[in-house]
């Protein structure tokens, strides 16, 4: 069954095309939505009327778009997995965690990652979808009883929440300890997550994927990629390119929103792992206009396990199973009860039938590895992010190099050069640039010093927005942005570690959305537009 629950009030967009990881979809224009916005009650009533009429399809998004986003693998908080041993220096419980229902009472170890594993889960999702594209192709769509589901299930099994599986949260945490000096229960940033992905893929060759990670200003070196892809053979091994970048100080610079959209529109894209301004990790898989489509890893569910015949248990989990997981977190359980009461009251007022009530019970039973997407305005995205691209062949690599930054060659966030500058030349350039106009930060090279480089993990990337401030790139008009009332300025860089020096020339002007920009939040300002099955 398909669902479209409008829980937000942002403008309906029937003008801009929809992009999802290299695919493009036309918006649906209907008489009901064209030229006007629907409030919450109107959207909810539209869903009820659609169900009573026997039509369970979205009236705002195309069926092909819904099928595409639903086919993306979604990994979220889990509860009840084998304990991850605590460290004596692991984060202690806080009042905030208790109020949010994220209190793990197991004194031996963590049996849930709620509250600290969101970046790990978004990184797992990025990797899982890269593997899905690699082994099943970008055009594959999830269907019940499809023979290809066997391969799909095999990929899911690699992420089951037990230490024996190669990409489990247990092994991500171990990599954090090993290469990033992260303690169990400590939040990962994009850099720590990408290093974990790189090492875990290297330790598990059956995945068929090698990882190229660049944390220095989005630079990619042609010779390094080819050496990694070919090794000692004549066969090109698929490469997952991970680029750690920072596009502003406190928020994404809207001047370069077009470049982020360009990344997501490339056929090699597997998503952008980042955060909603400072606290909530998200995986962006597409966009429409100035709004990004996200997968959210913050709904606790029962731990992924194996069934009687060795298959990963995920799609067949029931509403009761989900409630058992949520029951360990009082606040989540409370909100589930509130949602039930609200839905039942609305449906009784609409004189719905028993079949409609049954349908809504199914709606409440969220799938475990395929989920709805959420819309978020670009300006609410944290500037520190991890961009992923899957390169499957020599031709694919050449195509990616040709198209990345093609729209505006003079302004790029990904820079591809033939070879890396030698260390002596780099040191000469570094020393010759020193002056009062340069923000000088610790520089760390080599994988052995990861722990030193990631003391402040979310801030260890070069701020590329400074490049655009220097060139005086004019801001473009954004839907819902009142340019005349915008007054926020990006401040000079605070003291933080970057991978190389950054020239600071002047402050950067960033348009700011007004309070009533139409984006409401599940928590703050995140819209609740949801699309899925």
From Swiss-Prot:
GO cellular component: nucleus; phagophore assembly site
List of catalytic residues: 118 (nucleophile)
Entry keywords, A to Z: Autophagy, Cytoplasm, Hydrolase, Nucleus, Protease, Protein transport, Thiol protease, Transport
GO biological process, one term: autophagosome assembly
Location in or out of the cell: Cytoplasm; Nucleus; Preautophagosomal structure
Taxonomic superkingdom: Eukaryota
Statement: the UniProt record of this protein carries the keyword Nuclease: no
SUPFAM superfamilies: Cysteine proteinases
Enzyme nomenclature, EC number: 3.4.22.-
Pfam families: Peptidase_C54
Family per similarity comment: Belongs to the peptidase C54 family.
Biological role stated in the UniProt entry: Cysteine protease that plays a key role in cytoplasm to vacuole transport (Cvt) and autophagy by mediating both proteolytic activation and delipidation of ATG8. Required for selective autophagic degradation of the nucleus (nucleophagy) as well as for mitophagy which contributes to regulate mitochondrial quantity and quality by eliminating the mitochondria to a basal level to fulfill cellular energy requirements and preventing excess ROS production. The protease activity is required for proteolytic activation of ATG8: cleaves the C-terminal amino acid of ATG8 to reveal a C-terminal glycine.
Protein name: Probable cysteine protease ATG4
Source species of the chain: Komagataella pastoris
């Amino acid at each position: 069954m398909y669902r479209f629950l409008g829980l937000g009030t942002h403008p309906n967009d029937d003008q801009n095309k929809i992009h999802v990881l290299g695919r493009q979809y036309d918006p649906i224009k209907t008489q009901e939505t064209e030229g006007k916005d629907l409030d919450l009650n109107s959207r909810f009533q539209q869903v009820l009327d659609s169900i009573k009429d026997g039509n369970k399809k979205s009236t705002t998004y195309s069926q092909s778009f819904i099928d595409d986003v639903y086919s993306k693998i979604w990994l979220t908080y889990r509860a009840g997995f084998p304990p991850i041993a605590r460290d004596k220096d692991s984060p202690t419980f806080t009042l905030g965690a208790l109020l949010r229902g994220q209190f793990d009472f197991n004194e031996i170890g963590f049996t849930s990652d709620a509250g600290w594993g969101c970046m790990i889960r978004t990184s797992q999702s990025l990797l899982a979808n890269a593997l899905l594209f690699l082994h099943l192709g970008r055009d594959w769509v999830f269907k019940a009883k499809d023979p290809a589901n066997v391969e799909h299930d095999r990929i899911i099994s690699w992420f089951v929440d037990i230490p024996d599986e190669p990409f489990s949260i247990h092994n991500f945490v171990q990599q954090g300890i090993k290469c990033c000096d992260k303690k169990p229960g400590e939040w990962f940033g994009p850099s720590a997550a990408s290093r974990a992905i790189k090492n875990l893929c290297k330790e598990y060759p059956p995945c068929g994927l090698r990882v190229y990670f660049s944390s220095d200003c989005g630079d990619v070196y042609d010779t390094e990629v080819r050496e990694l892809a070919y090794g000692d053979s004549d066969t090109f091994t698929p490469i997952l390119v991970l680029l750690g970048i920072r596009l502003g100080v406190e928020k994404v610079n809207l001047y370069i929103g077009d470049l982020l959209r360009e990344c997501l529109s490339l056929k090699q894209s597997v998503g952008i792992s980042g955060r909603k301004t400072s606290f909530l990790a998200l995986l962006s898989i597409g966009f429409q206009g100035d709004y990004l489509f996200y997968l959210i890893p913050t709904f606790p569910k029962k731990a992924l396990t194996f069934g009687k015949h060795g298959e990963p248990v995920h799609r067949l989990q029931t509403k009761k199973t989900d409630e058992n997981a949520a029951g360990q977190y009082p606040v989540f359980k409370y909100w589930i009860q509130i949602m039930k009461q609200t839905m039942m009251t609305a449906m009784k007022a609409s004189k719905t039938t028993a079949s409609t009530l049954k349908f809504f019970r199914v709606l409440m039973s969220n799938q475990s590895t395929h989920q709805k997407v959420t819309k978020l305005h670009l300006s609410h995205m944290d500037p520190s992010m991890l961009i992923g691209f899957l390169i499957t062949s020599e031709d694919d690599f050449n195509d990616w190099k040709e198209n990345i930054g093609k729209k505006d060659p003079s302004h790029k966030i990904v820079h591809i050069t033939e070879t890396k500058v030698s260390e002596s030349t780099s040191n000469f350039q570094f020393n010759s640039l020193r002056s009062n106009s340069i923000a000088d930060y610790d520089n760390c090279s080599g994988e052995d010093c990861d722990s030193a480089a990631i003391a402040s993990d979310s801030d260890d990337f070069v701020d590329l927005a400074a490049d655009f401030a220097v060139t005086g790139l004019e801001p473009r008009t954004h839907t819902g942005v009142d340019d005349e009332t915008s007054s926020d300025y990006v401040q000079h860089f605070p003291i933080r570690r970057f991978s190389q020096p950054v020239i600071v020339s002047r402050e950067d002007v960033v348009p700011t959305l007004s309070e009533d920009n139409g984006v409401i939040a599940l928590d703050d300002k995140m819209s609740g537009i949801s699309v899925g099955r």
